[in-house]
Protein backbone atom coordinates (compact mmCIF):
# COMPACT_ATOMS: atom_id res chain seq x y z
CA UNK A 1 0.00 0.00 0.00
CA UNK A 2 1.12 3.55 -0.72
CA UNK A 3 2.52 5.48 2.21
CA UNK A 4 2.48 9.23 1.41
CA UNK A 5 4.55 10.07 4.50
CA UNK A 6 7.67 8.43 3.16
CA UNK A 7 6.33 8.10 -0.38
CA UNK A 8 6.80 4.36 -0.67
CA UNK A 9 4.68 1.40 -1.55
CA UNK A 10 4.70 -1.45 0.96
CA UNK A 11 3.75 -3.96 -1.74
CA UNK A 12 6.73 -3.25 -3.97
CA UNK A 13 10.37 -3.72 -3.17
CA UNK A 14 12.34 -2.35 -6.12
CA UNK A 15 9.73 0.00 -7.53
CA UNK A 16 9.08 2.08 -4.43
CA UNK A 17 10.33 5.35 -5.91
CA UNK A 18 8.50 4.69 -9.18
CA UNK A 19 5.22 4.11 -7.34
CA UNK A 20 5.70 7.17 -5.12
CA UNK A 21 6.44 9.38 -8.14
CA UNK A 22 3.44 7.92 -9.93
CA UNK A 23 1.12 8.62 -6.99
CA UNK A 24 2.54 12.13 -6.60
CA UNK A 25 1.72 12.76 -10.28
CA UNK A 26 -1.82 11.47 -9.80
CA UNK A 27 -2.43 13.61 -6.71
CA UNK A 28 -0.88 16.60 -8.49
CA UNK A 29 -3.23 16.13 -11.47
CA UNK A 30 -6.16 15.98 -9.05
CA UNK A 31 -4.92 19.23 -7.51
CA UNK A 32 -4.98 20.89 -10.94
CA UNK A 33 -8.45 19.50 -11.64
CA UNK A 34 -9.68 20.82 -8.30
CA UNK A 35 -8.81 24.36 -9.39
CA UNK A 36 -11.23 24.10 -12.33
CA UNK A 37 -13.82 22.26 -10.22
CA UNK A 38 -14.01 25.17 -7.81
CA UNK A 39 -15.46 27.43 -10.51
CA UNK A 40 -18.02 24.86 -11.65
CA UNK A 41 -21.42 24.34 -10.06
CA UNK A 42 -21.64 21.83 -7.23
CA UNK A 43 -22.85 18.40 -8.21
CA UNK A 44 -24.61 15.91 -5.97
CA UNK A 45 -23.31 12.36 -5.73
CA UNK A 46 -26.57 11.07 -7.13
CA UNK A 47 -26.40 13.38 -10.17
CA UNK A 48 -22.75 12.51 -10.85
CA UNK A 49 -23.42 8.77 -10.84
CA UNK A 50 -26.51 9.16 -13.03
CA UNK A 51 -24.47 11.12 -15.59
CA UNK A 52 -21.88 8.36 -15.69
CA UNK A 53 -24.53 5.63 -15.98
CA UNK A 54 -25.62 7.16 -19.29
CA UNK A 55 -22.17 6.52 -20.78
CA UNK A 56 -20.19 3.93 -18.82
CA UNK A 57 -17.14 4.49 -21.02
CA UNK A 58 -16.41 7.85 -19.43
CA UNK A 59 -12.77 8.74 -19.01
CA UNK A 60 -10.76 8.90 -15.81
CA UNK A 61 -10.87 12.69 -16.16
CA UNK A 62 -14.67 12.62 -15.91
CA UNK A 63 -14.57 10.31 -12.88
CA UNK A 64 -11.93 12.50 -11.20
CA UNK A 65 -13.97 15.64 -11.89
CA UNK A 66 -17.06 13.99 -10.41
CA UNK A 67 -15.14 12.85 -7.33
CA UNK A 68 -13.67 16.28 -6.69
CA UNK A 69 -17.05 17.98 -7.12
CA UNK A 70 -18.88 15.59 -4.78
CA UNK A 71 -16.40 14.49 -2.12
CA UNK A 72 -17.32 17.45 0.12
CA UNK A 73 -20.85 16.05 0.30
CA UNK A 74 -19.69 12.52 1.08
CA UNK A 75 -17.18 13.58 3.74
CA UNK A 76 -19.46 16.16 5.29
CA UNK A 77 -16.75 18.81 5.13
CA UNK A 78 -14.67 20.62 2.50
CA UNK A 79 -12.01 18.56 0.75
CA UNK A 80 -8.48 19.85 1.40
CA UNK A 81 -6.12 19.62 -1.56
CA UNK A 82 -2.81 21.45 -1.55
CA UNK A 83 -1.58 23.62 -4.40
CA UNK A 84 -0.14 21.80 -7.43
CA UNK A 85 3.53 20.98 -7.03
CA UNK A 86 3.61 21.00 -3.21
CA UNK A 87 5.54 18.03 -1.86
CA UNK A 88 3.53 17.66 1.35
CA UNK A 89 0.15 15.93 1.41
CA UNK A 90 -3.00 16.96 3.23
CA UNK A 91 -4.86 14.34 5.27
CA UNK A 92 -7.51 14.16 2.52
CA UNK A 93 -4.84 13.62 -0.16
CA UNK A 94 -3.24 10.82 1.88
CA UNK A 95 -6.64 9.19 2.32
CA UNK A 96 -7.41 9.52 -1.40
CA UNK A 97 -3.98 8.12 -2.36
CA UNK A 98 -4.49 5.12 -0.07
CA UNK A 99 -7.96 4.56 -1.47
CA UNK A 100 -6.77 4.68 -5.09
CA UNK A 101 -3.86 2.36 -4.27
CA UNK A 102 -6.23 -0.07 -2.54
CA UNK A 103 -8.47 -0.16 -5.61
CA UNK A 104 -5.50 -0.74 -7.89
CA UNK A 105 -4.33 -3.60 -5.63
CA UNK A 106 -7.88 -4.97 -5.29
CA UNK A 107 -7.51 -4.74 -1.50
CA UNK A 108 -11.21 -4.85 -0.61
CA UNK A 109 -10.64 -4.99 3.14
CA UNK A 110 -8.65 -1.76 3.08
CA UNK A 111 -11.16 -0.14 0.68
CA UNK A 112 -13.98 -0.94 3.08
CA UNK A 113 -12.00 0.36 6.06
CA UNK A 114 -11.04 3.61 4.32
CA UNK A 115 -14.57 4.32 3.10
CA UNK A 116 -16.19 3.42 6.43
CA UNK A 117 -13.74 5.60 8.32
CA UNK A 118 -14.62 8.80 6.45
CA UNK A 119 -18.00 8.37 4.74
CA UNK A 120 -20.79 7.74 7.25
CA UNK A 121 -23.80 7.47 4.94
CA UNK A 122 -24.10 4.05 3.28
CA UNK A 123 -25.57 5.44 0.04
CA UNK A 124 -22.84 8.05 -0.27
CA UNK A 125 -20.26 5.36 0.46
CA UNK A 126 -21.53 3.27 -2.46
CA UNK A 127 -21.48 6.31 -4.78
CA UNK A 128 -17.89 7.14 -3.82
CA UNK A 129 -16.95 3.47 -4.26
CA UNK A 130 -18.40 3.57 -7.79
CA UNK A 131 -16.58 6.80 -8.68
CA UNK A 132 -13.18 5.81 -7.24
CA UNK A 133 -13.40 2.38 -8.87
CA UNK A 134 -14.11 4.04 -12.23
CA UNK A 135 -11.18 6.39 -11.75
CA UNK A 136 -8.76 3.66 -10.73
CA UNK A 137 -9.62 1.46 -13.74
CA UNK A 138 -8.34 4.09 -16.17
CA UNK A 139 -6.14 6.24 -13.95
CA UNK A 140 -3.16 6.12 -16.31
CA UNK A 141 -5.11 8.22 -18.82
CA UNK A 142 -5.53 11.00 -16.25
Question: At which residue positions do the language-model features occur?
Answer:
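C-terminal-biased regions
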Residues: 1-142
Amino acid sequence: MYNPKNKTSANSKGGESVESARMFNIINKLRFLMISCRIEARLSLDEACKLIQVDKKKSAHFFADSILRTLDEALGKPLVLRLPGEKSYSFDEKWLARLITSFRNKDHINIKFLLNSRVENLNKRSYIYFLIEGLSQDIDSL
